[in-house]
Design a protein with these regions (language model features):
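Hydrophobic alpha-helical membrane context
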Residues: 37, 61-62, 89, 149
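Hydrophobic residues in well-ordered beta-strands that form the structural core
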Residues: 47-49, 93, 212
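A short helix->loop->beta-strand "cap" motif at the edges of active sites that frequently abuts
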Residues: 42-45, 80
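Active-site PLP attachment segment
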Residues: 67-111, 137
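PLP-dependent aminotransferase class I/II
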Residues: 4-12, 16, 20-24, 29, ...
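Glycine-rich, highly charged phosphate/nucleotide-binding loops
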Residues: 1
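Conserved active-site segment immediately N-terminal to the catalytic lysine
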Residues: 49, 53-85, 122-127
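Proline-centered loop/turn at the N-terminus of a beta-strand
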Residues: 19-20, 44-46, 63, 70-71, ...
């Protein structure tokens, strides 16, 4: 996140009743939160932390979610997967008004009259338009069990990242992002100097799956049509999007498998023209 561009965007949109800024943590690494919180207070906007891929992340030694944001959202499955056994999320906030509102909207804004006075719980009302965001007991049980393993998952991903960094540094056509001690590596993102998609196809032929985290919003059809934003409007996002590639990283990977991925990346990079 370019902090200067972030503040410029807020200034440019002040007249549009700007209420909040959503800050996405990419790959499990916190941005410059001190500056972000400062900007939020300066312009009187809420700071919402999108920590879907950052469960367990720390910032200056403190757990994210208990710092200066107005709201933080976590996923109980921080490593993105369409095949996850359980999908659920958690919203944390120290703002009672936001918490009450979230509790209402998570179940179609339905309120019941059941209370300590004995009113029956089949008497209900709908206060607003909500959605079905509450989770099943099975999902909750699985999520709680997985949450207990968070620290061990993080430790293993950091071990895998260390192998990638050691094996892939100084490899031609490959750029490794700067190492950060508090990075929890829900994604391990590298940059390919050119023709990223062909590189990914070559890896796939070797049995190595990769991912693209992420395609900039303004390039997606819905947002492109709705807001008519020029492709070049966000040069940082565009330049990174054209080069980035995510290598496999999850706690179940063995060192042998990680080294196999490295072998294929190195071999393809050496043959890259």
């Amino acid at each position: 996140l370019d902090i200067e561009k972030f503040e410029e965007a807020i200034i440019a949109n002040k007249s549009k009743k700007l209420r909040a800024a959503i800050i996405t943590f990419i790959g499990g690494l916190a941005p410059n939160l001190d500056k972000i919180y400062e900007i939020g207070k300066k312009y009187n906007i809420l700071i919402i932390e999108d920590c879907r891929a950052a469960l367990g992340t720390t910032y200056k030694g403190k757990k994210v979610g208990n710092l200066g944001a107005d709201m933080t959202i976590f996923s109980t499955n921080p490593s993105p997967s369409r095949y996850a056994i359980s999908r659920s999320g958690v919203l944390v906030t120290n703002n009672e008004e936001l918490a009450t509102r979230a509790k209402l909207l998570r179940n179609h804004a339905i309120t019941t009259a059941y209370d300590s006075y004995g009113n029956l719980d089949y008497v209900y009302d709908v206060d607003d338009i909500g959605h079905k965001f509450d989770i099943s007991e099975l999902d909750a049980a699985y999520a709680i069990a997985q949450l207990k393993k968070t620290d061990s998952f993080i430790k293993r991903r950091q071990e895998i990242a260390k192998i990638y960094e050691d094996r892939l540094k100084d490899i031609k056509h490959i750029t490794i992002l700067p190492h950060k001690n508090e990075h929890i590596y829900t994604q391990f993102i590298i940059k390919i100097s050119r023709n990223r998609d062909a590189f990914a196809r070559a890896l796939k032929e070797k049995g190595v799956s990769t991912a693209l985290n992420y395609i900039p919003l303004h390039l997606l059809t819905y947002y492109k049509n709705k807001y008519s934003i020029k492709i070049t409007a966000f040069p940082n996002a565009l330049n990174n999007y054209q080069q980035i590639l995510s290598l496999p990283i999850y706690a179940g990977l063995t060192n042998e498998e990680v080294n196999y991925v490295c072998d294929q990346v190195v071999q393809i990079a050496q043959e890259w023209i």
